Regions:
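A short, N-terminal "cap"/entry segment at the start of jelly-roll beta-barrel domains
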Residues: 1-19, 105-125
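Conserved short histidine dyad/triad with adjacent acidic residue
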Residues: 8-10, 22-37
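Ligand-binding loop in jelly-roll beta-barrel domains
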Residues: 16, 52, 72-97
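Short acidic-glycine-tyrosine-enriched beta hairpin
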Residues: 16, 45, 50, 57-75
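Short glycine/proline-enriched turns and hinge-like loops at secondary-structure junctions
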Residues: 19, 37-39, 80-82
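A hydrophobic/aromatic-rich effector-binding and dimerization subdomain
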Residues: 90-110
Length: 125
């Protein structure tokens, strides 16, 4: 599903895993979510390209093979690098897949993202 210029594919949702969820995410250069937080933990494993990531006050450039872990309720963001990128992400108990589906239905209107994500426990900063 497309969300604000990048793609998210649900590989496994909580109905299949008893809680955690797994996603494939990819996008062209410059795409990615703005700073946000949510109650669930999230980890990203970069497969290709580069991804500039911010977690709390730390910022790093993730290359293939890099794992980034984001504890729940921690502000974070990422932007796909110059050649775009691809990664696999996993969330702990939460409803990220439902939130992504709702965001995809918003026709990429970012002005609606805060209210939509808020219904799922996510807050944009």
């Amino acid at each position: 599903m497309g969300i604000a210029g990048f793609e998210i594919t649900v590989l496994a949702d909580q109905s299949k895993t008893d809680g955690y969820e797994i996603f494939q995410q990819s996008g062209p250069a410059g795409t990615g979510p703005s700073p946000h937080s949510h109650p669930w933990d999230e980890s990203f494993y970069v497969i290709s390209g580069t991804v500039l990531c911010g977690v709390g006050e730390e910022e790093s450039l993730a290359t293939p093979g890099t794992l980034i872990h984001v504890p729940g309720n921690t502000s974070h963001w990422y932007t796909f690098g110059e050649e775009g990128g691809e990664m696999v992400s996993m969330t702990s108990a939460g409803n990220a897949s439902e939130m992504y589906e709702d965001l995809a239905r918003s026709d990429t209107d970012r002005s609606k993202f805060g209210a939509i994500a808020g219904k799922h426990g996510q807050e944009y900063r």
